[in-house]
Amino acid sequence: MISNGQSRVKRLIQQLEALGITNKEVLRVISETPRHLFMPESLAHKAYENTALPIGNGQTISQPLMVATMTQLLMQHHCKNVLEIGTGSGYQTAVLAQLVDKVFSVERIATLQYQAKRRMRQLDLHNVAMRHGDGWKGWRSKGPFDGIIVTAAASDIPQDLVDQLADGGVMIIPVGEQHQSQSLVVMRRFGDSLEQQRIGDVRFVPLVKGDVV
């Protein structure tokens, strides 16, 4: 017998497939990652709905479709060494950790980072390194990265992140001001040349500078 939880996960995966997610590994990992662990218990009944949900500190856990879309875009380039800007709940981090060799994740809000670390241990994911700091600055000492994924909208593409992108690397980043038009951008680096492709309209919380203890 299929449990209610399993049926909700199955329904979510079917929705993602219908909305254009075709990478079977991405779909598998999302189906196996317990999203309900990454949010307040009071919202856990909504965990497998295709919607963003608040996690406190003015932050959200991204809509599953957006996590799947950004991950699928990254995986098209066979990234192994990935920098994530904005750990948040750690859900995107956990998905990445099951698909790439190493994830380096930067979070500006210390309480969120602490909770995300605990969840990584709970899920036995040990290929994740976390840092409390300003996401605009990246994590220079661990770069360059062949993939960078940014989970909040930057007003413009941070130069520090561009500098930490390896030759041939790809950055997936939402760009635009809060409450205004935002676009999901795929940036590729080829030596000193940069190529940008706009994927579509999105809505993210802003990528704020500085950090919070």
From Swiss-Prot:
It is found in: Cytoplasm. The keyword S-adenosyl-L-methionine applies. Its EC number is 2.1.1.77. PROSITE patterns: PCMT (PS01279). Keywords: Cytoplasm, Methyltransferase, S-adenosyl-L-methionine, Transferase. GO terms for cellular component: cytoplasm. Pfam families: PCMT (PF01135). It catalyses: [protein]-L-isoaspartate + S-adenosyl-L-methionine = [protein]-L-isoaspartate alpha-methyl ester + S-adenosyl-L-homocysteine. Signal peptide: none annotated. One of its GO terms (molecular function) is protein-L-isoaspartate (D-aspartate) O-methyltransferase activity. Catalyzes the methyl esterification of L-isoaspartyl residues in peptides and proteins that result from spontaneous decomposition of normal L-aspartyl and L-asparaginyl residues. It plays a role in the repair and/or degradation of damaged proteins. Belongs to the methyltransferase superfamily. L-isoaspartyl/D-aspartyl protein methyltransferase family. NCBIfam families: pimt, PRK00312.1. This is Protein-L-isoaspartate O-methyltransferase. It comes from Idiomarina loihiensis (strain ATCC BAA-735 / DSM 15497 / L2-TR).
